[in-house]
Amino acid sequence: MPLNPEKCAFIQSVQVSSTPPSLGAGAVLIPIDVIQEKTMASLAEIFQSFDPSSPFNAPENWLQGRTVYGGLTAALALHAAMQAGGSDLPPLKSAQITFVGPAMHEQIFKPTVLRQGKSVTVMTTDCFSSAQLALHMTMVFTASRDSRILHDYSQRPAVSQPDDYSLWDAGPHAPNCAHNFQKRPAGGALPFSGATDPELLMWVRHDEAQGIDPIVALIALADALPPASITTLTAHVPLSTITWTLDIVNAPAPDQWFLLKTSSHVAAGGYSLQDMEIWSESGELVLRGRQTVAIFA
């Protein structure tokens, strides 16, 4: 029985359109309800079914171009390590992530315990895609200790609460993964706005992340903003994060808005070095990080 084009989506590579163009040799008509059922999933649904010992295939709505959204891959790598570390594993304190190559197909996660001490455990997770290393993540898990050293000189930007700002639509050219988050600009600039100060400042939250470890959910959200340097551009260009270092400052609460700030301090030779800070709704700094980003412009 022929399919009704009005109830189908045209798929070629990873592009989806509700109205099919002239159909070529590589075109396929698939019912929209089938696409939504098989290729769309919330973060909560992903982690409900994720088994670190089995290959993982990312849904279409978590792709960033042809590759899997880096925040999701990092969160899955952390979750795999936490499962392997057991119930006595202390909370994550720091992580160093290298995006070695593209994760374009099914992913396989291999966690390893490097050292387990009284208060510090060091682990790695390697993620493979198409038999090639796609991500290498080193994690340090620490138990808190009594200390006479106590200070906090961090300062949250002067912003109002999330409801005081309007929701921002990233637009049709944004990658699929961008639509899994709610975003409310609270200052700084917008992507591709030709700004002179490369800084993004937005309240961000997951669409659906119930039942996920709060730190795992935070890692999945922490990379939700595009690199700050693209605020200086006026047109879309290819981007690729190479390294990501992060430190957990305070334990995040589940299912809330977070204030994300990313700033590019140096950009030259096709690479941008950017800092990121994340605060909770109550004003606590929960994460600090730095990324090296390749910009093809």
Predicted features along the sequence, with ranges:
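Terminal targeting signals and extreme-terminal segments of soluble enzymes
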Residues: 32-297
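Residue-identity detector for glycine
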Residues: 24-26
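Low-complexity, intrinsically disordered or signal/transmembrane-proximal segments
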Residues: 12-15, 36
